[in-house]
C-alpha cells in the first residue's frame, strides 16, 4: 500500500490535532474565588492562579489594573481590586490574560514561560514546540 506525501501529511495532522485536543482538556486553570468587602473585590486564590499559570503575580495584577482602569494591590495570597467587579468580568479578563500571555500562539499549548526582553517587551517561549513569539500587549 503506497501513500503519497499529502495523504501522510494529512494523517499526521489529524493525529496531532487529536493529541492537542486531549492536552487542552487536561489543562484547567483554577477558578477565581471572589469576596466583596465594601467597594473592593478580592481574589482570594490569586497566588494559586499565578503559580498554576507559571506567571509573576505582579504581571497579572498589572494586567487587571490596566484592563479594569483601577488600582490593584497584592496582599498575601490575594489580589485586592479597588472597585466592585463582577465574577463574570474577572473570569473574562483572566481568560484574556491566558490567551495573551500564557497560550502559545503557534501550537496553542499552555506549556510556556514569559521572557522579558528590554523594557516592557515580552516574549512567550513554548516548551512544547520551541517557538518564541512576541506578546502583542503593552503593560
Swiss-Prot record:
Q: Is the keyword Transferase in the record?
A: no
Q: Which domain of life is it from?
A: Archaea
Q: Which UniProt keywords apply?
A: Initiation factor, Protein biosynthesis
Coiled-coil ranges per UniProt:
none
Q: Name one GO molecular function term.
A: translation initiation factor activity
InterPro entries, sorted: IF2/IF5 (IPR045196), TIF2_bsu_arc (IPR004458), Transl_init_fac_IF2/IF5_dom (IPR002735), Transl_init_fac_IF2/IF5_N (IPR016189), Transl_init_fac_IF2/IF5_Zn-bd (IPR016190)
Under the heading Pfam families, the entry gives: eIF-5_eIF-2B
Q: What does this protein do?
A: eIF-2 functions in the early steps of protein synthesis by forming a ternary complex with GTP and initiator tRNA.
NCBIfam families attached to this UniProt entry: PRK03988.1 (NF003067)
The record's family statement is:
Belongs to the eIF-2-beta/eIF-5 family.
Its quaternary organisation is: Heterotrimer composed of an alpha, a beta and a gamma chain.
User: What protein is this chain from?
Assistant: Translation initiation factor 2 subunit beta
The record lists the organism as Nanoarchaeum equitans (strain Kin4-M)
Amino acid at each position: 500500500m503506497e501513500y503519497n506525501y499529502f495523504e501522510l501529511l494529512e494523517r499526521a495532522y489529524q493525529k496531532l490535532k487529536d493529541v492537542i485536543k486531549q492536552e487542552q482538556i487536561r489543562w484547567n486553570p483554577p477558578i477565581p474565588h471572589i469576596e466583596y468587602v465594601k467597594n473592593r473585590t478580592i481574589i482570594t486564590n490569586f497566588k494559586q492562579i499565578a503559580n498554576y499559570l507559571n506567571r509573576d503575580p505582579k504581571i497579572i495584577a498589572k494586567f487587571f489594573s490596566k484592563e479594569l482602569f483601577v488600582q490593584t494591590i497584592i496582599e498575601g495570597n490575594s489580589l485586592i481590586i479597588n472597585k466592585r467587579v463582577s465574577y463574570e468580568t474577572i473570569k473574562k479578563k483572566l481568560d484574556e490574560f491566558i490567551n495573551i500571555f500564557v497560550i502559545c500562539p503557534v501550537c496553542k499549548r499552555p506549556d510556556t514561560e514569559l521572557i522579558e526582553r528590554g523594557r516592557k517587551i515580552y516574549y512567550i517561549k513554548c516548551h512544547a514546540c520551541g517557538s518564541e513569539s512576541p506578546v502583542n500587549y503593552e503593560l
